[in-house]
Amino acid sequence: MVAQTLSADSGHGPLLQATEGYAARHATDAGAAFGRYNARLLAPYLISTPDKEETMSLPKHHLELLSPARDVHIAREAILHGADAVYIGGPSFGARHNACNEVSDIAQLVEFAHRYHARVFTTINTILHDNELEPARALIHQLYDAGVDALIVQDLGIMELDIPPIELHASTQTDIRTLERAKFLDQAGFSQLVLARELNLKEIRAIADETDAAIEFFIHGALCVAFSGQCNISHAQTGRSANRGDCSQACRLPYTLKDDQGRVVAFEKHLLSMKDNNQSANLSALVDAGVRSFKIEGRYKDMGYVKNITAYYRQRLDGILAERPDLARASSGRTDHFFVPDPDKTFHRGSTDYFVSDRKIDIGAFDSPTFTGLPVGTVEKVGKRDLLVVTKDPLSNGDGLNVLVKREVVGFRANIAEPKGEFEEDGEKRYRYRVEPNEMPEGLYRLRPNHPLSRNLDHNWQQALQKTSAERRVGLSWVAKLREERLELTATSEEGVTASVALDGPFGVANKPEQALDQLHDLLGQLGTTQYHADAIELDAPQAFFIPNSQLKALRREAIEALTEARVKAHPRGGRKAESNPPPVYPESHLSFLFNVYNQKARDFYHRHGVQLIDAAYEAHEETGEVPVMITKHCLRFSFNLCPKQAKGVTGVRTKVQPMQLIHGDEVLTLKFDCKPCEMHVIGKIKGHILDLPQPGSGGVNTIVGQISPEDLLKTIRKPAH
C-alpha cells in the first residue's frame, strides 16, 4: 500500500468522476449539503500552511460553544456532545484548586479535540505572587508544547514574561465592563475578551464594534454576585482569595438586612446569592450584539451537568446557524444526542438572564442557595416511615425529592417509590406513590396535606447520562479510482483536507461486476467505528475487479488514519497577537487595590502603559481599614423596592442614599450605594489574624481550600471572645 496526504489548499479537486450509471444510482443529497457546509467552514483552514505563522483567533463569522471541564474525561464528553472548545485547569494557577490536570493529560485531550478542530483553552487565571512567576512561565511553555490553543489569563504580569507565542484570552477576572478597558486589552495583545456578566446588549455591541478581539460571554451557570475580580470578602473573612481560586462563597450564606434606622428589611435570607445564568432566550440577540464565543460556567460541575448543558446549547446554536448562512460552526462534525437535554434536570438555583436585557427585581435566589428542582406533585399524607404523594410525572427508586419548610429545603432520597395507582385530574394523568425515604427527615412530620413536592434528581434520566449519550461524526467524501493495476482511495473531509492511499494490483476481473462495485460502495459507507460519516461516494471504475474484502477494509482503515493525521496537522492553531504600535495608554493614571496588581511584572506592565501610581492587591495585606470588599451590580435597595429610581416620577437621583447593613452572626457589613452606575458596595475590614498570615503564594504556610460550603464557612469565621 502507498499513502499520500494532500493539504487543504493543494489544488487537487476530486480525482475522478464516478462511472456513468453507477453514480446516478448512488447519488444522494448529502454531497450537496457537504458542499454548502464546506464553503462556510473551509475559509480559515485554507490559509493555514506549515511555514506561515498564524495569529488567527476565532473568525468573525464563527460561533463557538465553549464548555467547562473539571478533568479531561469531562472535556472529551463535552466535545462529543457538541462543544467547539473546552476550557480546563492545568496543574496549578487555574483558579479552581480542586480541578487540576497534569500537562500530559491535557496533551492527550488536545490531540482528541483537534480531530474535530475543537480548541482547548487552559486557565492561568489567578493573580500571581512574585515567587510564582517563574513556575507560571515554565508551565506556560509546557502547555504550549502540549498543543494548547490558548491561555485564559487574569494577571497582566504574564504579558511581561518570556513566554511562547501562544494565543491569550483576557479572563472575566480582568473585569471587562467598560469599552475603555476592552479596547486597552484588545490593543495590548489579547485575542479574545471574556466580558463581564453584568453587561447589557447595548454595552456588548459597543465593545464588539470597537475591538478586533473575539467577544466571549457567559451564557449559562452559576453567577458571582460581584463583578469578577472585584470580590475580596472571602480573603477578608477567611484568608482565602477568590482571585486565586479559593473563594469561600460568603455570598451563599444567610444574612439579615437592616436599614439606616436599624429596622429589619429581610431576616435570614440568602441576600447575596444569585439565581443561575440562563441566556437561552437571548442567544440570537447576543449573536447580533457581536458575541462569538458562548461560554458555559462550571469547572466544578460533574459529567452529567456538562453533557446536558452542552447538548442543550449545541441544539440552540445549531438552530441559529440553520437560519444564518452568513455564520458557521467553529468546529467540525455533526452531533447526535441520545437524550433530550433539559437544564431543569441538573443543578441550578433558578434562572435569570441577569442584566442582558434589563435590570430585573428577581435575580436573587434569596430563599435557598441549593437546587430544589422542578415541581413534581404534592404530599398527601406523612406516615411514620413513609409518605403518600401524588405526582404529575412517574417517580423511580433513587429519585431525589424535597419540600420547602419555613424557608428551609428539606430533601430526601426515595429509597422506594411504590406505585399505588393512577387517575385523571383536570384531564391530566396523575400518579400516586408510597415513598419510603432512605432516612426520614424530621421536617416532613410538620407537613400538611397537599404540600408542594419537588424533584431535584431524576434517577432514570441521570442513569441515561451515565451511558453513551451522544455521537459526533465528521463528514467526508470518498473518491475511489479502480484500475486493473491499482486502487486509489481519496478521502476529503468536510473542511477540505484530503488524504489518499493506494493498493497495488494487478487485480482479476470480477465475476459479478455489479455486486463487486456495490460491495466497494457499501464498504466505504460503513464507518461506524470511526469518527466519520460518508456524505458522498464516487467510484471511477470502467471495469469491476475482484479485491478481497479484507484488503479493502485494511485500505479503508489506512485512508481514515491518514485523513485524521492530516486533519490534526491542519488544525488552525492561533498565536500571540501583537501589541499595537505605539503601545496603548491605560486610561487611568492611578490604580487602586481593586486592580489586583500582586507582582512586579504586573506593575511593570501598567507602568509601561502609562500608569503612574499603583496600589498593591488586597492579598498584599496593605489595606487594613474598611474598604469595599465586594462591588456588585446587584442592589438590595432595588430588590426590596427601596431604590429612589423606582419612585414614581423620579428622573434622576440627587438625594444621598443612606447606607444599610448586612448581618450574619457577629459579622456586620455596611452597604453603600453608588446610584449613578447602579452599583452596591459591600464595605468590610480584613480580620486581624489574617494579616498575620503569609501572603498567598509567597511560599509561607497557608491552608488552601479549593471550595467550601456555606456551612463549613461558618466554622472558619472567628467569633470575638466573650
Region roles according to the model:
Residues V2-S10:
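Extreme N-terminal basic, low-complexity initiation segments
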Residues N98-A107:
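Aromatic- and glycine-enriched glycan-recognition loops and surfaces
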Residues E53-H81, A85-I88, S92-A95, L109-V110, ...:
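Surface-exposed amphipathic alpha-helical tracts and adjacent flexible/coil segments at the periphery
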Residues M1-V2, I47:
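Short hydrophobic transmembrane-like helices used for membrane targeting/insertion
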Residues G11-Q17, G21-H26, A30, G35-A43, ...:
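Short, low-complexity intrinsically disordered segments enriched in A/P/G/S/L with frequent Arg
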Residues M159-P164:
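Short active-site loop/helix that positions an aromatic residue
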